[in-house]
Amino acid sequence: MKHSVLLLFLLFAATAAQARDPAQVRAFRHTHPCPATHSTTGACPGWVVDHLAPLCGGGADKPANMQWQRTAESYKKDTRERAYCKCIKTKSTHCVLP
């Protein structure tokens, strides 16, 4: 029974850690205006807010773990991170974020 409770806690914690908080993005944008428009609100053409360390890999959903990234570059990084996160879910010990 203790193992089941621990497993459920770990699964819940992993899922909760991946949740994105819009308030954290607003906090990031407040101190890091859009590179294209220099605005702290609204659209930022050609740019996205990116997590330096992926959430699935334990990265925090906090402004300190965020950066502006060009949209085209984000597609490449997202592809690599999805492969990494998929590997983590298999519990492999050989997962490397390229």
What are these regions, as identified by a protein language model?
Residues M1-V49, A53-P98:
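Nuclease and nuclease-like effector domains acting on nucleic acids or nucleotide cofactors
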